A protein has these predicted regions:
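Active-site neighborhood of HAD-like aspartate-dependent phosphohydrolases
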Residues: 1-41, 53-55
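Non-catalytic pre-domain segments flanking phosphatase-related domains
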Residues: 1-4, 56-60, 167, 221, ...
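Substrate-recognition/cap helix-loop segment adjacent to the acidic, metal-dependent catalytic center
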Residues: 26-28, 52, 56, 98-109, ...
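Short acidic-hydrophobic, aromatic-tinged amphipathic segments that line or gate anion-handling sites
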Residues: 136, 208-214
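A short, structured active-site edge motif that brings together acidic residues
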Residues: 36-41, 64-70, 129-143
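Short, acidic loop-to-helix structural element flanking the phosphoryl-transfer center
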Residues: 3, 70, 78-110, 116, ...
């Protein structure tokens, strides 16, 4: 089971997701500054919205979070198509990795903090949404290890084996991806295509770390450990 993170791993969006969140807080609460003081790296959408609400002193009830996420997804559709191609792209080696996974009988899915609709919106912009038919998403759980577990369960189900018998590999670009993999007993392949260097990702405990998946040995590690 291969579970790919989206932001900073599969693709870079040029900040489209952050801009959509900023606009959502601005239109609903008049507070474009709600998320100014923290990084979104490795966070789930629900956790981002919850922390943003706390920053501006609004009670983070589930219904409040849901309403803001609905507005965010609407605005995200606009933001991803406003971004130019030079800033919105698929990272090196990712298409080859996805294709290799499918060709070798892997269950190839997503392991992302994005809510499902937001995930598909981001991937549709670069026409790779149809390569993934399952995953663990930010609307499965607010905590990354739990949504990764849900994605792994779905992948094992597709393979027709119990989760305990499946080799699960999480592909991500932050220590939080690595830690989520560790929490469920999965392997991790970390890529330095986001805000962290390969050394940082090794230090976090990654099973393997590469500058990107086009590097020698990366696809072999993905498929065979």
């Amino acid at each position: 089971v291969l579970l790919f993170d989206i932001d900073g791993t599969l693709i870079t969006t040029g900040g489209a997701g952050r801009q959509a969140i900023v606009r959502a807080f601005s239109t609903v609460y008049g507070r474009p500054d709600a998320c100014d003081h923290f990084s979104f790296g490795g966070m789930t959408d629900r956790a981002i919205v919850r922390l943003g609400l706390e920053q501006i002193g609004v009670a983070a009830a589930d219904a409040t979070i849901d309403a803001l996420l609905t507005r965010y997804v609407e605005l995200l559709e606009e933001e991803v198509w406003k971004m130019d191609d030079a800033r919105y792209r698929v990272h090196a080696g990712m298409l080859e990795a996805i294709d290799a996974g499918h060709a070798n009988g892997c269950a190839v899915g997503l392991g992302t903090g994005n809510v499902r609709t937001g995930a598909m919106t981001k991937l549709r912009r670069v026409r790779i949404h149809e390569r993934f038919d399952f995953g663990g998403f930010g609307d499965d759980h607010e905590l990354r290890p739990e949504l990764i577990r849900r994605g792994a369960e779905r992948g094992a189900q597709k393979l027709g084996v119990p989760l305990a018998e499946a080799r699960v590999v999480v592909i991500g670009d932050t220590p939080k991806d690595v830690q989520a993999a560790q929490a469920i007993g999965a392997e991790s392949i970390a890529v330095a295509t986001g805000d962290y260097r390969a050394d940082d990702l090794w230090a976090a405990g990654a099973t393997h770390a590469f500058e990107d998946l086009s590097r020698p040995g990366a696809i072999e590690a993905l498929l065979n450990g």
